[in-house]
Structures are given as structure tokens and as C-alpha cells.
Swiss-Prot record:
GO terms for biological process: glutaminyl-tRNAGln biosynthesis via transamidation; translation. Keywords: ATP-binding, Ligase, Nucleotide-binding, Protein biosynthesis. The lineage of its organism: Bacteria, Pseudomonadati, Pseudomonadota, Alphaproteobacteria, Rhodobacterales. One of its GO terms (molecular function) is asparaginyl-tRNA synthase (glutamine-hydrolyzing) activity. This is Aspartyl/glutamyl-tRNA(Asn/Gln) amidotransferase subunit B. The gene is gatB. It comes from the Bacteria. It holds the Pfam family GatB_N. It comes from Cereibacter sphaeroides (strain ATCC 17029 / ATH 2.4.9).
Amino acid sequence: MLDLTYEAPKPKVIAGAKHDWELVIGMEIHAQVSSNAKLFSGASTTFGAEPNSNVSFVDCAMPGMLPVINEFCVAQAVRTGLGLKAQINLVSAFDRKNYFYPDLPQGYQISQLYHPIVGEGEVLVELAPGIARLVRIERIHLEQDAGKSIHDMDPNLSFVDFNRTGVALMEIVSRPDIRGPEEAAAYVAKLRQILRYLGTCDGNMQNGNLRADVNVSVCRPGQYEKYQETQDFSHLGTRCEIKNMNSMRFIQQAIDYEARRQIAILEDGGKVVQETRLYDPDKGETRSMRSKEEAHDYRYFPDPDLLPLEIEQGWVDEIAASMPELPDAKKARFMADYGVTDYDANVLTAELDAAAYFEEVARGRDGKQAANWVINELFGRLNKQGLTIADPPVKAGQLGGVLDLIASGEISGKMAKDLFEILWTEGGDPAEVAAARGMKQVTDTGAIETAVDEIIAANPAQVEKAKANPKLAGWFVGQVIKATGGKANPAAVNQIVAQKLGL
């Protein structure tokens, strides 16, 4: 595992007009379960389908239609819990969360308030090389997503698309362990990375498949430590919840604004009202949405249509045995097996496809060289052209072939970059392309010696300077490489020049 040095969470300190204040943040992440069918029906979960085309009788609450649990969604929740080192509850239960809204046809949401499927876990968030913050997970529960209300299609009417209704969500609830906007964004990024590695959520925030509700409060220095001692949340101040955040940048902006808003109220002698707020990215501010409800406002009660969900430890063990290598373990292995730096390992493991690409290139080759080419040449070009690692123009096998030609001395580093450019635009086998384009280095020492002798004979003054100052021998190396059209092997040229000059 990673060799990480833990330190006490350093809070974001905001200077008010009268006092210093500290931030306290807890998050509820709504992650859409990667599943072809919904949580309690067989309707499709395909994104972007025609409005109301992925709706079953269960989803639209037709009379007499009963929910049937999707076993795969349950397995995905268990897999997520295991990935977060969490307690898997072998017995859980579903409850009805009652509220009325046009995009909720049942008049209630099926959720898990009292007995969630996953208990306490943790997420390790690396904030700097060797420094990590441990964010505790309070619980993960399964619930239904709601539909989508559309208000901008007609000036007088609102429309509802029920395609999303009943899609399985995992609500991942953290403890108030996050102490700043940057930490909050890093936590969401790390959680999304883990979910993608597990294959339990695609983490696509643009499509709403990963959304964050952010609870923000401010307190005076020293109050957080009192909370840690007593577990009394009153020490943390009154929290406000910012709903449905779907951007790392907006999460940071919203937290910063909300903290300053609360500080201004408190320093003016007022009280922060516990409420739900929305973030307006155009104005860069949060605004009130509704007063914050408590659990009793939703009149939760056990869903009479669903028996308690009982799973066997043997089934959990089977899922555990099929778990993939997760980001932290993969990073540690890359550093140990391939000798890459902490920074490079972070870049290479950020996405599963990137890690797989690198490993195919690096296997049996110089790991540091492979990392350099993947990060600087491949990723640099992908970013420049707005492409993704999922379908790169230069495949891992091709890049590996380029590195093999460098290792064998057949091409130089400069030739390799030219070859990479050709492969990017035209494709082909690296060795065949290099041969066809006459890109192979001159390694024949006889030919190199002839070129060196000619350059030395034509430049006697430069020879004397080089003998007086050996660093000037590089001039001869450059001239020889230039004379051979860039094809002479630099290492061989260096050796022969030094020998001829008696250095």
C-alpha cells in the first residue's frame, strides 16, 4: 500500500471582519448505479432516450404494480461498500420517503433510512505527495432517482420526463471531516475514481450520474476539536445544504461563497437558518431553495411492498473475490514495479484506461521511459486535440514498438518523436514505418569514424579549443549528427569523437 503520512485535518481559515472562522463540510454523493435496468423494474436506464420511452408500469406507479428488487443493483452497492472498506449489512430494509412533486409519480421515494445496505467506511484523499486525509463514510444506501421536470420548453407549461424515475442511486454520506473547498473537490474526484475502477458508477457529472449535496457550516477555531471530543454537532454551527452540484469547480465556488455568507450573518449578530440552497454559477452565489427538512418531515415508514433485504456472507465473499485492483494499490504497484515517481503514478492511475495503456507499454520495458512517453507525448497530444485515452490514435502496442526501436539503438529520441507523429496521423507498424522512411540510425562505426575524421580535419582551430576545454567536444558531435542527416547514433558519435580528440 501507499506510504502515506497522516496529519490532522487542516481547516480552511477564513478571516472575517471581526474573527477568524473555520469551515466544516459533509457531503452526500448521489451516484447512479451502472446497471442496464432500474432498481425495481426492468425498464432501460439508457441516457438520452426519447422522453418517457424508458418507463415501465412500476416506474409510473400504475395501480397494482409491485416493485421487484434488481439483484445486480444490490451487488453493485455491495461492491462499492467493499471498495470503500465499509461494513456490509447482511440485513437491510427499504422505507418510503413521502413527499409530493410532479416528477415523483408514486408520491414517495423508496429509500433506506433506518437500515442501509452499507455501514461505515472510509475514503483516503491524497492532498499532496505523501500526505492524505481520511474522510469517514457514515453509510451508503440504495434509493430511487426521481424524474426530470422541464420548464423551458413552453412559457406556460411544464413537462415531466419519467425516464430517470426509478433508476438506482447509491447515496454515499460522509462525516463532517472535510475542512476546505479544495478538499471537497479532491474527495469527490477520489470517490469518482474509485467508483469508476469498481465499475459501479460511470461518474459522468455532465449527465447527472454523479451529483453532490454539500453541507456547509462555519465555526470558531477550537470548536471542531470540541465536536471531536463530544460528538456534539452544535459545536460545528448551523449547516446549510447546497443541492445537486455537478462540477468540481462549482463545488469549490459554492462552498467559498456560502461560508462567507454565513460569516457575514454571524458577525452582524444574526443567526444562520438551516435550509437547502442552490448555487447559481452565473452569479457566483447561493440562493435559498426551501427550509431544510428533517427526517420526520418526510414521514418515513417501512415499505410494505418490499420484504427486508437479506444477503448471505458467502455471496458477499464472492463479490469480494472478484474485486479489481483499486487506485491506491495500483499506484503503489506502479511505483514499486516500474520505478515511476509519485506524481507520474498519480497521473497514470487517474483513469483505468490510462493505467491499462501504460502497463501494456511498460511491461518488459523501462518503466520510467514508458511513463515519460505516455504522459508527455501521448497525454499531451490527446489533451491538445480534445481526445480521450479510450480510443487513442497510437495504440499501446505501437508506442511499445517505438520504445523497442529506441532501446535497440535503431532510432534516436528525435527520430522516435518524428515516428510517433507519423503513427498518430497515418498509423502502421513502427518498425516498418521507420524502415520505409529511412529513419534508422547509423550505427556502423566505420561510417561514423569517416564523418568524424572529415569534421576534425576541416576544423583544426576547433580541435585545439576542444582539447583545452573538453566540454567543447559537443560541437563535433553536433556537426557529425548534422552531416549524417541526424541518423548517427549519438552515443557512438560521442565515444568516437572523444577517442579521436584524445579526451
